[in-house]
């Protein structure tokens, strides 16, 4: 939901050779509030008390949408009830600057992706995204560029963003 626009925009403007996604997601209903039995021993731990490394289906889903790209990923469940982010590191084909990357997302938020991508220059945290209907609230302060490596971060309210994308289908 949040990562597809990120991949599309970076690929369209700078070309992507490889990408690695880290989803930092609020704990989910299949996690207990205290340590208890679970088939995944990490998810057996208290979701409201621990940062829990896990898998993400986002990378696999993206390779179906962008079959020409090599994409990997992992997830972290963190002890917040809502408000998540997607952190993506790209190896790009064309040189770019932080300003150029940010401009791509700013323009997309006002144009082609205005229903899906929002843009901020504010120093936000997870609670600040609650109720935001965008699939991807692009955090321009967290953009990094090191040679051909580009890192971007989008925040999202998983329930609100997902619900709005479902409503878009109607």
Model-derived regions: residue spans:
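Internal hydrophobic alpha-helix adjacent to the cofactor/substrate pocket in enzyme cavities
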Residues: 164-170
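C-terminal substrate-binding/catalytic lobe of Rossmann-fold NAD(P)-dependent oxidoreductases
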Residues: 17-150
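Alpha-helical support elements that line or immediately flank enzyme active sites
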Residues: 1-14
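Glycine-rich phosphate/pyrophosphate-binding beta-alpha loops
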Residues: 77-81, 155-162
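A generic structural signal for alpha-helix starts
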Residues: 1, 95-96, 160-161
């Amino acid at each position: 939901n949040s990562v597809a626009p990120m991949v599309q925009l970076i690929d369209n403007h700078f070309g992507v050779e490889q990408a690695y996604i880290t989803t930092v997601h609020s704990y989910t209903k299949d996690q207990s509030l205290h340590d208890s039995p679970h088939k995944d021993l990490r998810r057996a731990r208290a979701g409201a008390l621990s940062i829990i490394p896990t898998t993400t289906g986002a990378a696999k889903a993206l390779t179906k949408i962008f079959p020409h790209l090599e994409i990997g990923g992992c997830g972290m469940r963190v002890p917040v009830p809502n408000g998540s982010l997607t952190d993506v590191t790209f190896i790009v084909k064309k040189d770019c600057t932080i300003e150029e990357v940010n401009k791509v997302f700013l323009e997309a938020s006002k144009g082609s992706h205005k229903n899906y991508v929002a843009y901020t220059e504010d120093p936000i945290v997870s609670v600040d995204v609650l109720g935001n209907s965008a699939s991807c609230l692009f955090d321009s302060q967290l953009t990094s560029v090191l040679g051909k490596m580009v890192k971007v971060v989008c925040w999202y309210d998983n329930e609100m963003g997902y619900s709005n994308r479902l409503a878009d289908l109607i």
